[in-house]
Amino acid sequence: MCGIVGYIGYDNAKELLLKGLEKLEYRGYDSAGIAVVNDDNTTVFKEKGRIAELRKVADSSDFDGPVGIGHTRWATHGVPNHENSHPHQSSNGRFTLVHNGVIENYEELKGEYLQGVSFISETDTEVIVQLVEYFSNQGLSTEEAFTKVVSLLHGSYALGLLDAEDKDTIYVAKNKSPLLLGVGEGFNVIASDALAMLQVTSEYKEIHDHEIVIVKKDEVIIKDADGNVVERDSYIAEIDASDAEKGVYAHYMLKEIHEQPAVMRRIIQEYQDAEGNLKIDQDIINDVKEADRIYVIAAGTSYHAGLVGKEFLEKWAGVPTEVHVASEFVYNMPLLSEKPLFVYISQSGETADSRAVLVETNKLGHKSLTITNVAGSTLSREADHTLLLHAGPEIAVASTKAYTAQIAVLSILSQIVAKEHGREADIDLLRELAKVTTAIEAIVDDAPIMEQIATDFLETTRNAFFIGRTIDYNVSLEGALKLKEISYIQAEGFAGGELKHGTIALIEDGTPVVALATQENVNLSIRGNVKEVVARGAHPCIISMEGLEKEGDTYVIPHVHELLTPLVSVVALQLISYYAALHRDLDVDKPRNLAKSVTVE
């Protein structure tokens, strides 16, 4: 949620900042702004709405300079409007600030220090910049004032501060909110995501919580909470900038759906040794083997992937597994086993709720593993181990290829642990994943069929239901989520057997019901559920699998191993959801009110 960019160097900053913000659009936002500094002045450009609107305003001015900060805002305090947009300035105009996060004690700070100050916005961010002015007026240097203010803040924040009287510096701090430092020859940058500033550098340094960073064009000084200078090595962000472009596709979501076969092949390659055997770091395997119970912590689509992963971990590896919604777990931790292993699943590696759980489990001394798409992310750094998805940048808000990558990696982990436990495998996983790859390609090739299904079943509806049994039920939850988040159709996923316990009361003439029928042992049962809803007027869309199909099924996916069907059937649901949204003329990649990376609790 939200995004920050900053540049200080020898070049004009305005265009670099605008391009950087465009690379952060996927994170979700409702307004955007930049502040640019030159020898004469600090000028702020900001607008409600899309960055394209901000660009019009910024491009209408010739003002530019070699220093600047930028921000995309997702409203948390105050409605989306011009006044609440970032950057914010202090009353005297000297200090300019961008901020991601939520300050929990801003009202207390406002009451204690800023009585009589006139505020323009309703935001917690303006309180921060006014506090910097307040302490500066008490005789503190800008660094001292900034450090003092940061010490008073309770909550999450990533901050970038400009001082009109010290035009050669950006002051930076973070806590529980992502922010990176990019380094170059004669310039330095800050960014919420390395993707934003790949246009100028691929070399980055991590910023840790509670650190203060003084950024100049030719040097960077990192200080810990006690004021001690910290030396930190840089790393190269191994991201191909072209991977983050739409190319020939109309939308990022469609591109990312089409990329799933390539992602499957990459995962097979990355998790295979020279002899063609599955491989994962032995320390990870040992921690899984030693665990008496696995607790999967995730949110949204990653939570749904965790539900599928539970099937692998229990059925193949023989490890009891629980899957928890991160935002609930952090406030209502269950009674834990004696030797738990916590597995955190997050595409971005920055999910705030999951990170909050990780902080607590680290305090308890429990082992942890992060499964993420982003090397060097917060969850990756703070967990004991990391397994990477190797899916490439996922830009569309609605996750597609990360979901299938998460399931594939969980299947590989489970099979290796099963082998270590001496449990006889009933599957040649590499061979079966290759079949999955071919099956996904076949479904992608059938995109026109999926578009017709979307037209036939979802063109005018306001409600839709997804049903399945056993592992199909887990996929039905993801299918419903995909549809609702991009088409705004009220969609819900249910276990087929639960229909008669309340949900069937919602079935009316023409109500679309998408039924997944890919599991042999419950095939008759789910088809019985379909008959129940048809008897009440439902319009059934049955997605089955070769070998289990019946006459009249809407679509039949290629045959794959039953436990791997989620990797295949979900692709059909992704495409159906995509076309349902497309036909409603909606913004598929950036649905309303949603953010790609939820970095506040």
Curated annotation (Swiss-Prot):
GO cellular component entries: cytosol
Keywords tagged on the record: Aminotransferase, Cytoplasm, Glutamine amidotransferase, Repeat, Transferase
EC number, as in UniProt: 2.6.1.16
Domain Glutamine amidotransferase type-2: 2-218
Enzyme class: transferase
Coiled coil: none
Catalysed reactions, semicolon-separated: D-fructose 6-phosphate + L-glutamine = D-glucosamine 6-phosphate + L-glutamate
Active site: C2, K596
Domain SIS: 284-423, 453-591
Entries under InterPro entries matching the protein: GATase_2_dom (IPR017932), GFAT (IPR005855), GFAT_N (IPR047084), GlmS/AgaS_SIS (IPR035466), GlmS/FrlB_SIS (IPR035490), Ntn_hydrolases_N (IPR029055), SIS_dom (IPR001347), SIS_dom_sf (IPR046348)
Complexes and interactors: Homodimer.
Stated name of the protein: Glutamine--fructose-6-phosphate aminotransferase [isomerizing]
Provenance organism: Staphylococcus aureus (strain Mu50 / ATCC 700699)
Classification lineage: Bacteria, Bacillati, Bacillota, Bacilli, Bacillales
Gene from which the chain derives: glmS
